[in-house]
């Protein structure tokens, strides 16, 4: 059984997610896309996000609000920030650039918080050990799940209907034979997706697959979408049955069809 520590970490993290004023953040940051350049390594927020929000081994974890997190990140990087601003935003005020970076980091943080919830939920509900670290994240791996004799990467896959080019993940290039599983995730409700499937002239089956995914997700009162226990347990069972034979990229639609149970 999962530890009391893991369950407590999950509950504490969910309380943090529920405390976020998502509507205010969206109104403030959604229109702002002034900082779209690739950030230099010195400004990479991933190590800070892991430091402040991935606390799976702590007995009494606590989590910073986004504003406090951003203040910490900003104050630690005054010199590289000054160089970045002089290079790309000469003549602009620090306030202008700061707001642009706030919006940029908020979008990154929401994505990271989502994958962290999957990891906290996994630790609280599953037996297979999970590993998460910024070094893995930099390779496109949200977490590693260890089975007997192998390790499988996971990557949260947000809902999309665009055709995508098939490109090999950096992690898979470095470790031949290792599998990477896409974990489908949608912000839409099952009812919304079922209705779209009924009305669709194309993509009807895809909408139905996403509706199946949505049945394994839940929504906090503020609208943040989180993973149900049924989701991670379905993925664990899929890995226990198939891990030795999995290799390469396991796309989200196969996961939805074979791993997730129908409602």
Swiss-Prot record:
The set of disulfide-linked cysteines is none
Q: What GO terms are given for molecular function? A: DNA binding; type II site-specific deoxyribonuclease activity
InterPro entries in the record: Restrct_endonuc_II_TaqI (IPR019073)
Keyword flag Nuclease? yes
Task: Read off the Pfam families from this record.
Answer: RE_TaqI
Q: What is its EC number?
A: 3.1.21.4
**Which UniProt keywords are listed?**
Endonuclease, Hydrolase, Nuclease, Restriction system
Q: How is it modified after translation?
A: Only 15% of purified enzyme (upon expression in E.coli) can be sequenced, suggesting the remainder has a blocked N-terminus.
GO terms for biological process, alphabetical = DNA restriction-modification system
Catalyses which reaction? Endonucleolytic cleavage of DNA to give specific double-stranded fragments with terminal 5'-phosphates
Query: Mind telling me what this protein is named?
Result: Type II restriction enzyme TaqI
